[in-house]
Regions:
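Juxtamembrane helix-entry segments on the extracytoplasmic side of multipass membrane proteins
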Residues: 1-3, 28-32, 36, 62-66, ...
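Glycine-/small-residue-enriched transmembrane alpha-helix faces in small-molecule transporters
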Residues: 1-37, 129-132, 136, 147-177, ...
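Hydrophobic alpha-helical transmembrane segments of multi-pass integral membrane proteins
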Residues: 2-6, 32-52, 129-136, 159, ...
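Helix-helix packing/entry segments at the starts of transmembrane helices
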Residues: 11, 37, 97-104, 179-196, ...
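Specific transmembrane alpha-helical segments of multi-pass solute transporters/efflux pumps
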Residues: 13, 54-98, 140, 228-246
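Hydrophobic/aromatic residues within transmembrane alpha-helices
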Residues: 24, 34, 38, 87-89, ...
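C-terminal-most transmembrane helix of multi-pass membrane proteins
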Residues: 39, 118, 251-315
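Hydrophobic transmembrane alpha-helices of multi-pass small-molecule transport proteins
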Residues: 46, 123-145, 279-300
């Protein structure tokens, strides 16, 4: 249950990404700068945090031992996750982007047997079934808006988000396997940020070539995203997944808490960007998303009690 609560908190901070990225897009900012600046700001922040703990050297040592896996899965887990997600804000509001990104819930469940073939782990069916409830809510939440959007805009929003939704759990889990508990959460995020820098420098060059330098307001908002979503939310989410990394049902449950981003992003846009309040269909979708999150939490508790009957007796 602790991992689930931490996951929900991370969803709250992650929602800042969708709200402010949409805000920057509406103000005419470049999606490439919004994406690359976030990670450029994250690097010194993480160096300060990990440096204060005197844990930077183990990270660099681990990277030097096997730089290729670090570079590959950091680029996948951070670069191919966040760049497409930011690009999608051109074609849809933040809450719609957040809703579509919930495909990551199913992606995380279906990746289970592919990522650990030696242990022959099965797809957690219970988690997949509950995830379909969440996705049904996601569909209803975006239905009203999607009906008024041109097909080209829908495709340019959805396809990048499919890539993003698969890349995030894939990169995260492959790095957990590679690190194998040798580094803590902050160290792992620092290492991934360092090794994804070539990707962000290339993207910033593209941003400069197409839009010039970013405006001061975009730099400020990107810094806020870096702190709230890039550092706080990412650390909370990775910490939650680390707590349950060897238990598939619970890991799928933690990843499912990210569906809360839809709710937080929707109400954040209403309050901060004066977005229209959703209709009945969208509200029904939000309720399904919440129901799915609750069911995942209950399933996590049930699974824990089944494995440890003494916990039930103690209560």
């Amino acid at each position: 249950m602790k991992a689930i609560i931490i996951g929900i908190l991370s969803a709250l901070f992650f929602s800042v990404t969708f709200i402010l990225n949409r805000s920057m897009e509406l103000d005419g900012g470049s999606w490439a700068w919004s994406a690359s600046l976030r990670f450029m700001f994250m690097l010194p922040l993480l160096l300060l945090i990990v440096g204060f703990q005197r844990n930077v050297k183990p990270v660099l040592h681990h990277i030097r031992k096997k730089p290729l896996p670090w570079f590959l899965w950091s680029t996948v887990g951070f670069g191919l996750f966040y760049a497409p997600l930011t690009f999608a804000t051109i074609y849809g509001p933040g809450w719609l982007v957040a809703a579509t990104f919930q495909l990551t819930i199913l992606a995380g469940s279906f990746l289970v047997p592919l990522l650990d073939k030696e242990k022959k782990q099965k797809i957690p069916i219970q988690a997949v079934l509950i995830s379909f409830i969440i996705l049904s809510g996601v569909f209803l939440t975006q239905l009203e808006h999607a009906s008024a959007v041109p097909l080209a805009s829908v495709l340019l929003c959805v396809f990048p988000l499919i890539l993003s939704a698969v890349a995030y759990p894939l990169g995260n889990r492959k790095m957990m396997q590679h690190v194998d508990g040798q580094l803590n959460t902050f160290q792992r995020i620092l290492g991934m940020t360092i090794m994804s820098m070539p990707f962000w420098f290339l993207l910033s060059i593209y941003g400069f070539a197409t839009h010039g330098l970013p405006e001061t307001t975009q730099v400020t908002q990107t810094f806020i995203v870096a702190v709230f979503s890039g550092v706080i939310a990412t650390v909370l989410f990775f910490y939650a997944t680390e707590l349950v990394r060897n238990e598939n049902e619970k890991l799928a449950g933690v990843e499912a808490t990210q569906s809360g981003e839809v709710v937080f992003a929707l109400f954040g846009e209403i309050l901060l960007l004066n977005a229209a309040f959703p209709g009945i269909v969208s509200i029904a979708g939000i309720l399904l998303v919440i129901l799915g999150m609750v069911l995942h939490s209950l399933a996590t508790v049930y699974e824990n009690r089944k494995k440890h009957p003494s916990l039930k007796k103690a209560q």
